[in-house]
Every structure is written in C-alpha cells, then in structure tokens.
Amino acid sequence: LIPIALPGPTDMSEFSSESMQPRTPDEARVELASTSIRDAFEGYNAHFRAITQRARRRFEQRDWLGARSDAVERIELYDRCVAAAGARLAAQLEAQSQDKALWARIHARYAELIAGLLDQELYKTFFNTLTRRFFATRGVDAAIEFVALSIAPTDRITHPVARRSYAVAGDLAAVFARVLADYPFAVPYADPQDCARKLAERIGEQLADWEAPPVRGLELMETVFYRERRAYLVGRVYGESRFAPIVIALMHTERGLRVDALITERAQVAVLFGYTRSYFHADLETVGDAVVFLRTLLPHKPVDELYTVLGRAKQGKTERYRHLFAHLARHPEEAFVHADGERGMVMAVFTLPSYPVVFKLIRDRFAYPKTMARAEVEQKYRLVFHHDRVGRLVDAQLFRHLRFARRQFAPALLDELLQGCRETVQTDGEDLVFSHCYIERRLRPLNLYLREVEPARAIAAIVDYGQAIKDLARSNIFPGDLLLKNFGISRAGRAIFYDYDELCFVTECRFRALPTARHEDEELHAGAWYHVDENDVFPEQFPQFLGLSPELREALLEAHGEIFTVGWWLALQEDIRAGALADVPPYPSRLRV
C-alpha cells in the first residue's frame, strides 16, 4: 500500500485574514479544524483518483492481478484516510475534541469553505464520518452533521458531464470507426474496421423496432469505465423520437483490443451498473454530474447504487440513509416486518414492505448446527466487500448506530429483536438503536420463487442458480450452503447469493467422493458412517438437499451436472492455484459481437 500523505496543518494564525483582528483561541481552532478536514478530504480524493487512473495502464498491459490489487486498495482507502484525519484533529483540538459546541462552529465554518466547490456532498459525507467517529453518534446529530433528507445531492449539479457527440447521416460503420479512433489506447485494435462493422450490424439488430433509420446520433462520456478485464464506453443512442443507453464493451486479448459486446437494453445496462458487481474505476472530474447523466440512462436506478458502483461507497451509504429516512417520514404508520423466507439461523432479517431493502442483524446465539462466532460472520461480510462479486453476491452495506422509532416495528418482530439480538439492539426512550446492521437490496428467495412462477420461469431460474454456483466458484468463492433459501432472484431474473456466514474460498475446501459402504450396517446407518472434517465437501450430495421437483432437478443436472462431481471441483482448484483468473462476462452471450 502507498503511505497516505495528507496535507499539513493549516497555519494557526493569530489574525483573521478578513479583518486582521486578533483571533480568539477558539476561533483559531475552528479555522484550523475546518480547513484541516477540507484538506484531508481533498488529499483522500486525489489519492482515490490516482488509484483509479491506474486502470487504463492495467488494461493496456493486461495486468489483471494489479487491477484486482488496485480495487482492494481503493476500497480500503477511505477508512485509512479518515483514521489519519481523525488522529490529526485529535492532536489539534486536544481536550476540546469532544466539545460539541466547538464542533458546531467547525461545522458552520466548513460549510462556508466548501460552498463554492463541486461535489459538495462528498465533502459533507467525509465531515459526517469524522464527527460520528469522534462522538459515536446514535442516529443523527444535526448540530454537527450535514442532514438534508428532502434535498437530493444531484439537485445542485450544474457541471455537465464531458461527452463526445456523433451525428449519423449514412454509414453507421464509419461512425463507429470514428468512435474507436476517438478512444485510443497504448495498444492498437486488432481489427478496428471489423469491430466497427460488427457494431453497426448489432445495433441495427438490437434497435430493429425503431423507426428507420433507427440511429440518428450517439453521445458517449469522455471518461472510459474500467472493471476487471474490460473497458466500457458509456452513453446514449438517439433515434428520431427516442433514445436508449449504449455501452460498448472492450477487451484486451492476446491479439490486441477488440469490441466484445454492445448493450442497448436498459435492463442489461442496469445489471452492469448493479448492486452485485464490483465497483468501476472511472476517472471522473466530478462524480455528481456523472450520476446525473447515468440517471438519464437508468431512471429507476437508485442514486445510492450509482454512487456506490462508481466506487464512492461511503457516499452511496449516505444516499441510501437519506432516501430511507425520507421514505419513513412519508410513511410514518408503516411497520417493519419479518422478511419473507425461512427464519435465519444466524441473522434476524426484516424489511419495510414498501421499500426494496432488507435489514440484517446478527443474533446473539446461532441455531444448531451453526458453530461460528459473531466475529467470523463479520469477517465473511468484509471478505465479500473486498472480493470480486462477479454479479452473484449482493452488496451488503454496514451501518452503525441506526435509530428507528420503536412504534414502527411489528410486535412479533420487536419481540424477536429485543430477545434475540441484545448485543446489537438497545432501547433509548421511544427509539431502537442498532449498533451494527447490514442493509441489502431485497431479493425474492429462490425457494419461494420456484413455487410461485410458471414452469418455464422456474426452469430458467434453477439453471441460472447452477450458473451462479459456477461463476462464484471460478472467482474462488464457495457458498458453503447451497440451499435454495440462501439464494434470491433479482428483478432481472438473476440468481444471487446473499447468505455469507458459511462462505469460504474454493481453495480452502476438501472436495471428496462419497465413500462406498462396506457392509449393510454402514449402508443403513442413519447418519454419516464415515469421518467428516470441517472443510470436507461432498458434491454428490448437493442435489439431495435441494428439494427440487423431478423436472427442475433434471433441468439443473442437464445444464450444470458437472458441479455435482468431485472431478470438476478438483480441476477448478488446480486452475485457481496455478494462477488462472476467472473471466465472468457481465452480460449474456447474445449481446457479444
């Protein structure tokens, strides 16, 4: 990791720059602290962009391990910078570091300092993070935090995103050739004319239901988006009276650059920018204007998810909090209830019916046969936060010290939380405070979904469940518990894993064939008659515990029967240990050119 070099402390002058009047010690501390926080954020932001800017070089050099290392470093950067800034502030403020009256003045001065800056919301979130670390705030303290539930962060955006425009008057392939020429890399395209021709063909196919000619213009963001092994050009395609998103996916193969896919379906672009994907590395001059532009492509995508997928995970949490509590203020009579699905052995899971997320609290005691400790569960969630999620792991955001009105909880749920989650749930007057809570997008549990839909959709879901296991395995993730209840189906119909307490690396498992019974007593034994170690996995047993109908079982075995064999897993382990990196395309094969 590169050491963080935050800007040095601002000079603690005795005189006001405006009036040249002597400052009181408190005034000097306010100025010092507020400028120190601003400078600390700008130091963080510069470091964030420096890491992000490496993505182009990683792509050009096919340095996929380096790209993965950058992704982890950038995720960890925020907390490292906050810790460094907090230590500096504690030294600057000394005994007054816990003085809320002083912090209220720091808050006011900080607001003045950032008033004319772009991406003010990022500055504000950084400030809030620091005050919450100093005071362990339960809920929100408006005197020392920036709170504006009714104002969206994008309301103030006036800085348009930089983009390139292309008018289409005739030869569409020539326009795409110009597009590729406008986005050069240190390595050439293997066959740019062929790529342009294929793009023209595919866009004609995908927009065949538009009026002729379907394409009148293109508009692409200047910034290239990078993630894993691909680079993306993102923008809009215009017809006579409509527009659609357009994403051109580029790959760097051993033979050079080539176009891998063209995506104009809004649903597939939403998946690309979704909550099951790792974060993009896109060097944006300002983030808010990019979010505004992306919202024109994906109007139903929550703002918090767009900030998050752009790598601004802390801002994503801020926006999720803002939107959630604005929703609660509009629906004060609606109650939190148990989430649909089987009761969790490790987590208490609840939801608000009108809001598309679930809340997960770790139980004080886990039901048999779960044996792990609370710290192990938290570690699993941290692992997912840092790992490549390959579109199959839901992004679980950790919130601390959340405060809710006690009256908004259904009686049965309230009783369960107070009795079974005492380490996490505290009562404070008429409120409940959750010291540790994961919030995730709500999915329909797969076991329920299969009972509710027609056979064709059930078959598609169970086949995608098998594909999800393969995608995770190739990224070195073994779910641990393959039961259908631990997977959910997204609105796009994708199978997503969301129960992480038994998740582990594929390379940590010992995949074994089931021993053959040596005599009748062993064959008739009620339990396992053979020794089973903690990390032993028997793939042949998987289908026995899924509870599938004969039709669904047959469909799963036909499509993905190899995942129920020891040989497939052992071969995969060898590949992973040899350094093979999985490439899981974030779009269906039908969109590839």
Segments (PLM) and residue ranges:
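Conserved ATP-binding subdomain of kinase catalytic cores across diverse folds
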Residues: Q206-E452, D464, R474
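Catalytic activation segment of kinase domains across protein kinase-like and atypical kinase folds
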Residues: F478, L483-W529
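Active-site-adjacent segment of 2-oxoglutarate/Fe(II) JmjC oxygenases
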Residues: K380-L398, R510-L548
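Noncatalytic N-terminal accessory/assembly modules of large enzymes
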Residues: E14-A267
